[in-house]
Amino acid sequence: MAFHFSTGRSVIGRRTFILGSSISLLGLRFPANAQSTAKLPRIGFLGATSEAGFGQHIDAFRSGLRDLGYVDGKTCIIYYRWAEDDYARLPTIAAELVALHVDVLVTHGTPGTRAAQRATSTIPIVMMTSGDAVGSGIVTSLSRPGGNITGSTFFVPEITAKRLELLKEALPTVKRVAFLVNPDNPSIRPTLKTMDSTATAQKMELQIIEARRSVEIEHAFSTMAKTGADAFVILDDRMLVDNAKEIAALAAANRLPGAGPREFADVGGLIAYAVDFSNLYRRAAVFIDKILKGTKPSDIPVEQATRFETVINLKTAKALSLTIPQSLLLRADAVIR
């Protein structure tokens, strides 16, 4: 009997030890896992518009990161925040990302970059598509940006003026051109100056038509029709780009030829001249990688956009009974037939 009792105690002791060891090991695993997650680099993404509006560009951004080994949830954590075309929300969501203690903050567009700049002077910021970063005071210079911001930039005035020139080349008789703008865009002043001089050189009259939000775009086209515009040009503004489909539809309904961003021609607009934005978003990963590996943003030169594309939509030209000069078609990077 004593032998039986003694063996029972021994068995229970072993089971207790095994069970206790398992619980102990499991308990050690969870903190280790949590700790490894906490060590993953944190990337904050500040979007001035919507994720749906970003489309292929956000895919390019993720692809660029993936090529360098950064996969959301596995080797990094990405926090996305979207202002949904409401620039007034940018300071709030920029502060929200700062409060998450991200290691690097990614912005697109000048309004988003400015909001991030005001929210933090210590967290590195990578701007993806800010217009004239030096002229707007975001960085000191392209080669030595200073502060906590680096990334890519392009010059909105020159791009928009080029659209006006292409429109004139495609439609030599055009006289009165509406310029569809978001007046809240920080690039508006220098762009208007460049557009005025370009319109004068091309012997065209320029009319400024404003739309701050997507709900104002339809009214903008009503104004174009009332003022007798022959054609229109779109400012390089994120809100307007994201609403390219509606703009193209309204242009078709009013039989107005227009020139704008790449997205505009893709969804039915006549002419597009634009920066290859997908390339810029993909390049953002290079800046992020350098910063996460210890390089200060002030020591990383700002890159200027160098890849541009001209697109002609011949389907739209046919619908508008327009004949596009062969010389322009031959120079186009893409022709939609």
Positions of predicted regions on the chain:
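Short hydrophobic alpha-helices and adjacent helix-cap/hinge residues
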Residues: 1-337
